[in-house]
Amino acid sequence: MQTLDSSEDADLELMFAEIRRYPLLTADEEKVIDGKKWAAVAALSSVFAEVDDLRATLADLLTNALECPPEVKRFPSREQHFTLRRELAPYFSDGNLAQTATAGARSLRKRASSKRHEKAVQDLAIPASLTVGIAVFMLRRAGGQFSDAVADAIGHWSRHWLAPPAPFALEPEVLKAVRRALREYTEARDALVMHNLRLVHSISGRYRGRGVGYLDLVQEGTLGLIRAAEKFEYSKGF
């Protein structure tokens, strides 16, 4: 029978103490927090459409997704490659949004009104986690820093694009807007995760002693919870 050693016991006590600080959310609280998350995503999408360099970078990313998709041998780990493919798959040449990606890349490169550019970005239906990853990738091209696994993967992939992306400078107000939206998104997503983390521990406890370590189960469950928090849309009920 599997037992926990003293170090695992200590780790669990710390985790349980942290979890107790975050009660389950009411429906209204969840709605408010999720609303902040999606407002931040919308703000990033608007910046993509409004700023020439960001618009061009998004167009380049779409073109490369269609013509130069990421190959596993180009990445330091299979996990990083999988992370990016999972996000980009709809925009590959055989993906269900391939035609939208083609049209979007073309529209974003054209001189047009801000409304047309914003519609082109909206039509792409970029998921929250990919929107954030692209934003962090763009921020890094401009000399900024922010932690994000999807952006890490895009960075590795971009070294093998048809034409490697060049760095660019962003106006201070643009940098401020991007950083603010990233911070607000991360805070909202993390709040959804922390307030639901006790559910992960509860489910993991049911499988305790079945050949997989409890802490490993918690880790896997937490990763799944983060993914769910990124996708969750309160307005749709899932």
Which ranges hold each PLM region?
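Charged, compositionally biased N-terminal leader segments and the immediate start
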Residues: 1-9
